[in-house]
Design a protein with these regions (language model features):
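Conserved class I S-adenosyl-L-methionine
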Residues: 1-36, 39-48
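Class I SAM-dependent methyltransferase SAM/SAH-binding core
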Residues: 49-91
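A conserved beta-strand element that flanks and buttresses the S-adenosyl-L-methionine
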Residues: 102
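Hydrophobic adenine-recognition pocket in adenosine-nucleotide-binding enzymes
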Residues: 106-107
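A short, conserved alpha-helix within the catalytic core of class I
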Residues: 110-121
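C-terminal alpha-helical "lid/dimerization" subdomain adjacent to the S-adenosyl-L-methionine
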Residues: 132-176, 183-185
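Conserved Class I S-adenosyl-L-methionine
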Residues: 182-195
Length: 199
């Protein structure tokens, strides 16, 4: 699996994300942290460097497991005291059961049809699914060089992703779940949108 430098190194990944989100970086994680009570199992799908765990959940009474296809990220998570498994969500294996199933800024990897992944997350969740996804993206910039560079930097090993969600297309995806969507809100200075769904 050939990945961009950003996805090969946790520190570079974090540095890039901090640059993109600036003062709103921490808000990406606290918005999720506030929705998760103590004493539950959390499954973080496509967890990347597991920043949700290391920043928010590690010191709480939460049974956290992160899944990611990047073995280096998973090894870092385990070294930090969490549970992690190398897992390619594309293989359609049922996801491990948990109370809360989370995905942050990774749903675009499953375009053009991300609904089957959301359905598998719902099947694994006992209480809720929490999804956050960018709705403002450099990869869709009108500046061709900026867009091409952003797509290349965010290649997680499945090829540069040309497509991203807008707020309209993301809302359309979650509209199909009707009343099962119990919350939707812009977070991180309006760069991302958060959705909470019941199983």
């Amino acid at each position: 699996m050939r990945t961009s430098l950003v996805y090969r190194n946790r520190r570079i990944y974090e540095l890039l994300m901090r640059g993109l989100y600036r003062t709103h970086y921490a808000a990406r994680f606290t918005a999720i942290d506030e929705l998760i009570p103590d004493g539950v199992r959390v499954l973080d799908v496509c967890c990347g460097p597991a920043t949700l765990y290391t920043r928010c959940l590690r010191d709480r009474s939460i049974d956290y497991t992160g899944l990611d296809r990047n073995a280096g990220f998973v090894a870092d998570l385990i070294a930090a005291g969490g549970h992690g498994r190398v897992w390619d969500v594309r293989d359609e294996t049922p996801l491990p059961a948990a109370d809360f199933v989370v995905m942050q800024a990774s749903l675009y990897h499953f375009l053009p049809d991300a609904a089957p992944v959301v359905d598998r997350m719902r099947a694994a969740a006992g209480t809720a699914v929490i999804v956050t996804e960018p709705i403002r993206n450099l990869a869709t910039s009108e500046h061709r060089v900026v867009a091409a560079l952003a797509r290349r930097c965010t290649d997680a090993g499945d090829g540069a992703q040309a497509h991203r969600f807008t707020e309209t297309t993301l809302d359309a995806l979650f509209d199909r779940y009707g009343s099962r969507v119990t919350r939707r809100a812009r977070i991180a200075g309006g760069r991302e949108k958060l959705y909470v769904l019941t199983p």
